[in-house]
Amino acid sequence: MSQLTEIVEQALAAIEGTDDLKALDEIRVDYLGKKGKITDMMKMMGKLSPAEKPAFGQAVNQAKQAVQKHLSERVEGLKAAELQATLAAESIDVTLPGRRIDNGGLHPVTRTIERIETFFGELGFSVKEGPEIEDDFHNFDALNISEHHPARADHDTFYFNPKVMLRTQTSGVQIRTMENEKPPLRIISPGRVYRNDYDQTHTPMFHQVEGLLVAENVNFAELKGILHDFLRNFFEEDLQVRFRPSYFPFTEPSAEVDVMGKNGKWLEVLGCGMVHPNVLRSVGIDPEKYSGFAFGMGVERLSMLRYGVNDLRSFFENDLRFLKQFK
């Protein structure tokens, strides 16, 4: 019996002395296998008297059970520790910041349009839109642009046929508004316009905002005051502004508006004037009773000046290196 006790103690010590699952399986075979040390003890049964056999057999079985139990507990413990180590290695630290999703930003042209709409909206101007495919009446005739005016030439205008074209300005929106609504009117009309031109400062498609005010007793001083305030608000500077006499078929008198640049040179930013009586007559408004003023500005031109962009084409190339500057 002392030999059996010694074998059990050796087995338990071997089990406790290893952290390797493969080694534990080898210990199981060495002690509990068919040729294992504890199994071999059963061979001694033949040398015992009948009276001793039951007690000895019971002792061997108890030894087997003790070693098997200790072995199972050790295997389970090691597997649990191995699992915990694996989970710890694969765990996610929820305190770490997540992956940032890049947010989009408004295009500089969109920003400029919104600034213009906000300013004139505070003055009571509503925003009107119209078709980009226009007929010659709304694009030319109603605006007092004669049949032989250079603006009607093929090299300036994209024609579908002699009477239908891509609009060259958003003035057609003003004509449609005056046809359908009665004065007093205060509107701005932002939108895309098209001209057959492409270089560093021109593109075939660009954005324009035109404004119109028609009411009784409207004068040029009001136009100057509004545009003065607009330019100073838009550029957020107390700019020098000048009005130069000019010519547009749809306004009389007409002027072009310049601002003083940082380089000390005048920069043209928009055109304006008092609505020509012929334009009012073309939409059934009495020019003896009503007068008005109109103005128009290129959105890309204003964006270039505000953001210091040198090439107009940058706005249309979808270069993220350029666009990310305006987030």
Swiss-Prot record:
Pfam families: Phe_tRNA-synt_N, tRNA-synt_2d. GO terms for cellular component: cytoplasm. It catalyses: tRNA(Phe) + L-phenylalanine + ATP = L-phenylalanyl-tRNA(Phe) + AMP + diphosphate + H(+). One of its GO terms (molecular function) is tRNA binding. Mg(2+) binds at residue 252. The keyword Mitochondrion does not apply. The keyword Transmembrane does not apply. Keywords: Aminoacyl-tRNA synthetase, ATP-binding, Cytoplasm, Ligase, Magnesium, Metal-binding, Nucleotide-binding, Protein biosynthesis. InterPro entries: aa-tRNA-synth_II, aa-tRNA-synth_II/BPL/LPL, Phe-tRNA-synth_IIc_asu, Phe-tRNA_ligase_II_N, Phe_tRNA_ligase_alpha1_bac, Phenylalanyl-tRNA_Synthase, tRNA-bd_arm. Its cofactor is Mg(2+). It is an enzyme of class 6 (ligase). Belongs to the class-II aminoacyl-tRNA synthetase family. Phe-tRNA synthetase alpha subunit type 1 subfamily. This is Phenylalanine--tRNA ligase alpha subunit. It comes from Shewanella woodyi (strain ATCC 51908 / MS32). The lineage of its organism: Bacteria, Pseudomonadati, Pseudomonadota, Gammaproteobacteria, Alteromonadales.
